[in-house]
Every structure is written in structure tokens, then in C-alpha cells.
Amino acid sequence: MPIIAFNSATDGLDPSRRSRGHFVADTRLDDDGPWVPYAEGVWFQPCCFNVTSGGFSVVLKGLPGAQLGVHYHVGTVRGYTMRGHWRYLEHDWVAKPGTFIYEPAGEAHTLVITDDSPEPALILFIVEGGLI
């Protein structure tokens, strides 16, 4: 995707100067190659990054029993569970395939793939803003 440089703040208001390209990410969920190590037993595949807001979209994969450290989101988070079971230690629900979650900005939590998950968990996360 080309980078467009503007001479002034109002240049970007001209619809003819805006980028209209689409971006398509092939996540290849069953391929071992494109996964980035994140924590013990946890990997992610980046789908896109918003360099303006710090937001990002990723597919997270975790083995049963794997856990991320407690973390904090400065913006909202949406998650959709495609495979496996997972939860936050700070809540009493368990996400299973088909579960959609919404997190308000400012929540701190600890993600855990449940020990009894029948397979590695695959979750699509769309994060607005940074992760601390």
C-alpha cells in the first residue's frame, strides 16, 4: 500500500487524495509457519496495525493451560472465539467457539486457555489503542 504525503492538514480532506486500497491478510490458521511467539504456549498472527491509534487486530493461539500475564487495555477490545476454550481469571465466564466478547477501555485481566480446552484456542482480537 503506497504512503501518501500531504503538504497541509487539509490535503487529506480531498476525497481524490485518500487511499482506497484494501488490505487482505491470509492468516493460514493451520500452518505452523506464520505464528509469532508471545508467551509460553501462546502465539499470535498479526492481521493489521493502526500506527495512528496504536490499535491492532490479531489471531491469538494458545495451548490448553497457557496463560498471559495480567495486562491492561487503554481502549476497547472485541474478541471472537473460533476454537478452544479460554477465560479471564478476573471473570467467571468461559469463552467457547462462537463466543463474542466486548471489553470496555481500562480493564486489566489475565487471559488463560482452560486446562480442559479440547484443542488449542484460536481467538480473533480487535484492539483499539495500546496494550500495557
List PLM regions with ranges.
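Residue-level recognition of well-ordered beta-strand positions that form the cores
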Residues: V59-K61, H85, I126
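Short acidic-glycine-tyrosine-enriched beta hairpin
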Residues: V51, L89-A108
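Ligand-binding loop in jelly-roll beta-barrel domains
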Residues: A95-K96, A105-I132
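Short, charged/polar surface micro-motifs in flexible loops or helix N-caps
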Residues: T52-G54, L63-A66, H85, E107-A108
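A short, N-terminal "cap"/entry segment at the start of jelly-roll beta-barrel domains
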Residues: M1-G54
